[in-house]
Amino acid sequence: SSGIGQAAALALSSPNNRLILVSMKNKEGLENTANKAKEKGANVLTFSADVSDYEACKSLLAQANEHFGPIDLLINNAGISHIGLFQDMTPDEWQRVMNVNIGSVMNLCHLVIPSMVHRHHGRIINISSVWGNVGASCEAVYSASKGAINSFTKALAKELAPSNIQVNAIAFGAIETPMNAWLSKEEAEALADEIPAGREGTKEE
């Protein structure tokens, strides 16, 4: 509905392509993305669902299969962050980020893999972050969740390779998206100074 997810959806939008777009809260953004994808000729089905909920994932995929058939490409992009000292986090805040960031990946992979294995074909792309490799101060849970995605992706890639299913993760650096909109001008400039290109990446890139 925004950011990297929206850019990926539009990049995949072309005549006869069938897209299933999911967002939990941003219904306006979801509708906007769907309309842009349709303008490019794609067939689009949208769902408002919490992908950290296994039963919600099961329901939306059942409906998607009924409309479009089995999933060929799964992009796991759901993600939230929590900024602050680890010692100030509550267990519920920690669990919520983990549920969305890694729980959603496991839910959707678990539900689409059987069909992919049966058809001996499938592609899975998990959206990760450089913080999953190096960690980020005051983003302990976000870093942990992305590190989990990286390890899960490597393990699943080995497990599914004999079934002709490719599993990869993209560990983005700093990208100009709504998730980073909270940065002050000074913080954004300091972040840009640490990037060789001297700026954040764009979602289109």
PLM features: what roles do these ranges have?
Residues 1-2:
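Conserved glycine-rich cofactor-binding loop
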Residues 109, 145, 153:
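Active-site helix of classical SDR
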Residues 129:
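Residue(s) in the substrate-gating loop at a strand-loop-helix junction
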Residues 114, 158-162:
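Alpha-helical segment proximal to the catalytic Tyr-Lys
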Residues 15-31:
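Conserved glycine-rich Rossmann-like NAD(P)H-binding loop of the short-chain dehydrogenase/reductase
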Residues 85-86, 93-95, 180, 187, ...:
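Substrate-binding pocket helix/loop in short-chain dehydrogenase/reductase
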Residues 86-87, 134-140, 162-163, 198:
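Active-site loop immediately N-terminal to the catalytic Tyr-X3-Lys motif
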